[in-house]
Design a protein with these regions (language model features):
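Polytopic transmembrane helical bundles with strong interfacial aromatic enrichment
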Residues: 1-209
Length: 209
């Protein structure tokens, strides 16, 4: 009975942890893009994103990770024979890497709070998809256990990565084209303003003459 309680709260922890990771790095994307904005929008947005990231990391993401790990340990204490299963050993290795990813996000958060941006928005989008791949593989391991079809899983994960890469590239292209259109529409207005200023200056010279 204790095992089932531990398992239930382990699943709750996983849901909370992954939800926090997905949203946290998405905030990183917006934070980096806010750095490209002119003042005062840049400072206002960055300050807001720093507050949101800090609260999300401390109040949701980290507690979710702790609950996941603690409940997993409790499950292993009640049923230590599970440690002999290959699928669980692989799953634990993936979770260890995911914990490293979790702490890497904390490092990026501190860097951005210090106005240091090591990654661009597109790189952040790539980083944001890492938990998706881990989630898929971990869930498949938990469901199929030692019966997981490795060939199908490998091809499926590869297809997922290719699809995510295509989406990221398409969005980057769309964003670049939108910027070019915005710049193109802004140039004529700037030219008109320059012409008006020049005409006003010329008129002033004529009146002075």
């Amino acid at each position: 009975m204790n095992y089932l309680w531990f398992k239930a709260f382990h699943i709750v922890g996983v849901v909370v942890w992954f939800a926090g990771l997905f949203y946290l790095v998405r905030l990183f994307v917006y934070h980096v893009e806010a750095n490209e904005q002119p003042e005062p929008a840049r400072s206002i947005l960055q300050q807001q994103y720093q507050i949101m990231e800090k609260r999300l990391y401390k109040l949701i993401t980290t507690p979710g990770m702790v609950l996941t790990v603690v409940m997993a340990i409790a499950m292993l204490v009640t049923t230590p024979e599970l440690l002999r299963d290959t699928w669980l050993q692989v799953k634990m290795s993936l979770v260890a890497v995911l914990i490293g990813y979790h702490h890497y996000c904390a490092r990026l958060m501190k860097q951005m709070a210090a106005d240091k941006f090591a990654l661009g928005s597109q790189q952040m989008r790539w980083l944001n998809e890492v938990p998706t791949v881990f989630l898929v593989v971990i869930v498949l391991l938990a469901v199929f256990k030692n019966n997981l079809p490795t060939d199908v899983t490998a091809w499926g994960v590869l297809a997922l990565i290719v699809a995510m890469a295509a989406i990221i590239q398409l969005y980057a292209r769309k964003r670049r084209l939108d910027k070019e259109k915005l710049a193109a529409t802004a140039d004529p207005s700037m030219s008109s303003m320059a012409n008006v200023s020049a005409n006003n200056g010329h008129a002033s010279e004529v009146r002075a003459g």
